[in-house]
C-alpha cells in the first residue's frame, strides 16, 4: 500500500497548482488564514475526487440517484481511499429527527422495549397479560343483549402490496366478505389494491347478535378469527366503538387489549406507535393568548388585540359588535385596559361564551338586537386555520401561534398503550429524556431476569457502546430525545464522528471540518483521543482546524497561505509541529511560538455604570439563575458544552430585547424579571447565517457600498450625456443589465437526470450588463470591472471618494480585503458572512446604546483573523456599545472586560452561574473549568511560547 496520498496540480478555486504528499494513516491538520484555500484542497479537491471515483464504480442505475459529480480541477491524485466527509452542516431540520434516531440508538431501544418490556394498562396502570378465548367470550357476552357485532380477523396490518393471495385464500376458505382499509368488500367482486400504499385487511368471520343462546356460535367464530389472525380479534360493535381483543395482552379490570409488542409500535414515525393527536411530533401549534394580546396595558381601542380579523375595533365592525356585547355583560368599554378585565371577562373574550348567547346590537342592519353565542377569539382563529385553503390567511394566523407540548402525550410522541410498557420502571420516552451519562448509569444498574438477560444482553451492549461513543466526543450532556434541528454545527459533526467510530471501519479517508467548534477546552482531550482512535484503526484523517491543541496532537501539519483569496492557495509549510514552531514563513507558526500574539488589554472597562439584569432564568437546564451584564463592555459568556450559554443568550436575552426594542415577534424563554431595557435602543444578532440566499446578493450590495458606486457612475460625464441614472448600473432591474441572462451573468441549463449546468451568458460573456452600460467608465474602469475588484484593490481605486473609501476600509479592517466586491454571497463562508455584517455595523453612525450579540464568532477563523475580530469588537465597545459573545476561544475570552461563566458541568449538571467578573477574577476561581485554562494564558500575558 502507498505511504502517501499524492495530489498533483490542484487548481480548484484559488489553489495555485499545488503539488503535495499527505502521509496515510496519520492525523493531518490543514490550517491557514480564512479563505486561504484549506477547504478547497481538503473538501473540493481530495474529498470530491474520492467521492467521484466511488460513485463512478457503481452501476449506472445507482448513479442516477446520486447525481453526476464533476471532476475537480486537479491533474491527478494517487493513493486515495474511499472518502467520508464529516462537516458542520446541522444533521436535519426534520422535527421527527432526534439524537436517538440519528445515532440509531433509538432503533435498538425499540427492539429492547418490544422484547423484554413489561406492558401495563394505559388506563389503570396494572400489569396486563394475555387473554384466553374464554375471557374474550365473557367480555362479548357482557355486551347489551341484541347488540349486533361483526367479528373480524385482521390478517394484514399496515403493509404495502396488492395482497392477491390473501383474497384468494379467503375465497377458498369460503369467506364472502372482507374489510379493506375500513370499507366492506364482497369477495365476489374484482378489486385491486394500490401496490405502494399500506393496507389493513380483515376477514369478516361472522355477524352475530348477542343473545344467551348464541354463546356456542360466538365461541366458534372467535376461535376461527383468532386462528386466522394469530391471536387478534376485532369486535366491530354496530352503533358503538370497535373492541380489539388479543390473546396476547389485556387488562381484566378495564377491558383494554393491546397487540403483541413489536418494535414498530415504539416508533413515533410509524402510525402504529405515534400519538394520534400530534402524529408523533410531540408538539402542536396552538394560538397563544400572549401573542393575541402581547401588551395588556393597552385597551381594545388602542390595538391590544393583534389577531387576524379581530384588530379592527371601529364602530360598525363585526369585532366591535362582539366586544361591545361582552363589555355590556362584564362592565368594560373599548377604552378599558385589558389588565383591568375580570378573569371571567378575559376568559370569554379569548375562549367564548359556550352556549350562552350575547345580546348583539345590530341596529345598522335590522334596527334591533340579536342573541347569539360568542365563539371566542382563539377558537375562531383555530377553526379558520383548519378550514382555510389560503396560505396568506394561514400565515396571518400563524403569527399568533406558538408550539406547545401535545396535550395528549405531553411531548412524548407515542400512544398511551406504548408509553405504558416499562423496563426497569421507565417507559421508552422517559429513558430517551435522560442524558447520555444518566442513560448509561440506568442500563448499568438495570436488574433483569435470566430470560430477559438472554434476550436483551446483546441489544443492551449495542446501546451502551453507542452511548459510550457519544460520551467520548464530549456529548455526554445531550438527551436522546433532543431534536436534531436544535443542535449546533459542532454538535452535529461530533455525533456523526461518534457514529463513524461505532462503524469500526479501517482504510478510510476521513475529512473533518473544525471538529473542536463549540467544544470547551476541558473536552478537547476527549475529542483528540477519539480522533487518535480513528487513526489507530488504520484510517487517514485530514482535519481542517485552527485549534492549537489539535495542531500539537497532529502527526503532520499543512499550512495553506500565505494570505487569503487570490493571495493564498499555496503550501506555505508542511511538516511536524516542532518544525512549524521554527518556521518564519508561516503566520500560524509565529502565533503558536509566541512571536505574534493577541495582546491582553492593559485596562478592563468598568462599563458606563448601567447594566441589564435578568432574574430567574429557567429555560432548558437553567436553574432559576440570575445574570447581570454591565453595559458599555465586551462581555464573554463561557462554560462547558451544554452548560446553558445559548439558553440564556439566545433564548432569553436576545429574544426579549428583540421583542421590546426591535418589535420582533419573538418570545423570550422563561424568566422572572428583566431590568434595564430602557438603557438600550436596539439589539443586533451578528450570526454566521448567509448575507444573501441568491447569487445576486454580494458584499457590495449587502454593505450598501454598491449604491454609492452606482451614484458615482451616474455622475460621470458619459452617463449624464446618455441620460443614465443610478438604476442603469443595477443588475437587478431592466435598463442597464443584460436581458439574455437577466443580470446573472450565467444561464442555467436544466439537465433533468443530471445536475443543472451553469454556463456564462453568450451575449454579455458573463459581465451581467449590456454593451451600452459597459461603455460608461470611471477612471478607466466600467461597472463590471469594479465589481470584479477585491476590496483591497477597490480601497486604492476609490481612495479619493471618502464616502466609498470609508465603507471599503471597514471591510478591509474586518479581514475581507481578499473578497471581490461582486462575489456571490452564496459562496461566502459563515465566518466571512459574519464579518460582512460586522463591517456594515461599523460603517453606521453609532448611538452608543446598541447591544451586539455574537454566538461563537471565531468559528472558521485562523488566530490571525481572530486577532482582527477582537480589534473590531473592541471598536464597537469603544463607541459606547455593548458586545455579548458566547465563546470558547481563550484568545477572545482573555480580552473581555467581563465574563459570565456557566456550569459547572453540561446538561443537568449545569445551568448555574459559577463565577462572574474580570478574566483575572475568573482565573482565580477553582470551581471554574474556564478559569483553570484561562490562568496560564493570562500568566503568559503578551507573547511567549505556548506550553505543550
What are these regions (language model features)?
Residues 1-948:
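Conserved phosphate-binding elements of NTP-dependent enzyme cores
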